[in-house]
Amino acid sequence: MPTALPAWQSLSQHAQAIRATHMRDWFAAPDAEQRVHAFTVEAAGLTLDYAKNRITPETLALLLQLADEAGVLTLRDAMLRGERINNTEHRSVLHAALRGHAEDDYRANGAAVMPDVLRVRAQMRDFAQRVHSGTWTGHAGQRITDVVNIGIGGSDLGPRMVCRALAHLAVPQVRVHFVSNVDGTDLAETLAGLNPDTTLAIVCSKTFTTLETMANAHSMRRWFIEHGVPEAQLKQHFVAVSTNRDAVVAFGIDPDNMFTFWDWVGGRFSLWSAVGLSIVLAIGPEQFETMLDGARAMDRHFASAAPRENMPLILGLLSVWYRGFFGAASACTVPYCAPLELLTDFMQQLEMESNGKSVQRNGAAIGTDTGPIVWGTAGTNGQHAYFQLIHQGSQIVPVDFITTLEPVRSLPGHHTKLLANCFAQGEALLRGRTAEEVRADGITDAALVPHMVFEGNRPSNTILMQRLDAASLGALIACAEHRTFVQGAVWNINSFDQWGVELGKKLAKPILEELEGAPASVAHDASTAALIRRAKAAR
């Protein structure tokens, strides 16, 4: 139990000792610049400034002691060796191998995995080149102009986020679209205006049984046929990303057009695998492999950097600090970079599906809060929506600001205004605004002054990239993955299963049968039974 560790007990006492200290005092001290220097880390093209946190050098030392006592780096090494650290599913956790090079010695169950990884990567590269060159055509001999990725969860969020983030690097030959929701509106609106003769579908499902994905895949199959694509030629319009060859063949997809991956790849960590085929088609193999290299650089940093200089380790420990010792139930991710607007959606799955657990690896209760709610939007939009709560609300919400020093699209004056707002929000959260400062600004109405006071002392990190390119994005995502791992390792939970999503899927099956007219096969609670009756009556 993490709360029984000596470092946890020391941190609990330390948190009480510094709770009343305002960060303004630390930044007013003569050694403020030294604080910034000490609490800044660089890795793989990213710069992390974590000086605006409610920590001292002693805090950092205790957090690193906690990591040591919890065996975080020992578990890290076990993961990278291919040991089965996903103990509930008896699987290795080797997403780092997906961005590896031939000389990297990643192993699962003792067997080298890089030959298979490189084989599938080459298959993806070859396929993308065939599509981009027009060698791969639809049934009528026309080149592919549009690609629709059908998937959900890890088969959608990561690739969708990357394709949006790197849209400025997109190849001109194809447009990539994403469909995830079983609500038919999602697919219908995506297909509206597309030409079936020049459209390719990627059906992305590890098991090829995912309800939402297969419903959309079958509907798209009907769309092709209804628009004149001969059934025998559907193979020119479908490829699969899956591990279930029999189901792929039964659907009608040529097994030669199946891209596989492995059970040591978790869905939310899979965009680097064949699940990223849509990314390769969107930005080209060269940019995709540059993204892999950026992630690999972060992997190497995480594996070898000293603890005090280890960016993912520090970020993960800060998350534990606020969740466990300040009661921060949520954490906000705000990229001041419009192309990263889907990053928070990706981060929600990455962190909340990984660490939304209440039992330890051995099944015992954890004894502390875990898995904060992750939320946010792109800046500056968030400033005009929810920043009021972050600044003056009754709870602490740690914020991660993410931005680039160079603009993605250059319009005169825009990027400097963006950066000014990003930096100002972090400063405002730190400093706050005292009653004296409010009055000094000319506010004479005594009743109004309390409403204009900002407590400040609200923590934030700032992550800087020189520019948003494939390498920096790869490093940013890999950093987030490893940060998530660190949190789970401290809490002693398995961050690589997701049993919490299974029960709802199981219960949906008999309800679906009832909605389609079958008699009830299971007993429901009164509320659910009433909802089913209403839905059936409305049909």
Swiss-Prot record:
Primary localisation category:
cytoplasm
- Alphabetized InterPro entries for the sequence: G6P_Isomerase, G6P_Isomerase_C, Phosphoglucose_isomerase_CS, SIS_dom_sf, SIS_PGI_1, SIS_PGI_2
One GO cellular component assignment for this chain's record is: cytosol
Q: In which pathway does it act?
A: Carbohydrate biosynthesis; gluconeogenesis; Carbohydrate degradation; glycolysis; D-glyceraldehyde 3-phosphate and glycerone phosphate from D-glucose: step 2/4
Location in the cell reads:
Cytoplasm
List all membrane-crossing ranges. none
Task: Please list the residues that make up the active site.
Answer: E353, H384, K505
**Catalytic activity from the UniProt record:** alpha-D-glucose 6-phosphate = beta-D-fructose 6-phosphate
What GO molecular function annotation could you give as one example from this UniProt entry? glucose-6-phosphate isomerase activity
- Provide a GO biological process annotation: gluconeogenesis
Q: What is its EC number?
A: 5.3.1.9
Q: SUPFAM superfamilies from the xrefs?
A: SIS domain
**Organism superkingdom:** Bacteria
Q: Which residues form a coiled coil?
A: none
Instruction: Please give the PROSITE patterns that the UniProt record associates with this protein.
Output: P_GLUCOSE_ISOMERASE_1 (PS00765), P_GLUCOSE_ISOMERASE_2 (PS00174), P_GLUCOSE_ISOMERASE_3 (PS51463)
Keyword entries, A-Z:
Cytoplasm, Gluconeogenesis, Glycolysis, Isomerase
Job of this protein: Catalyzes the reversible isomerization of glucose-6-phosphate to fructose-6-phosphate.
Q: NCBIfam families from the xrefs?
A: PRK00179.1
Query: What HAMAP family does this protein map onto?
Result: G6P_isomerase
What name goes with this protein?
Glucose-6-phosphate isomerase
Q: Which gene encodes it?
A: pgi
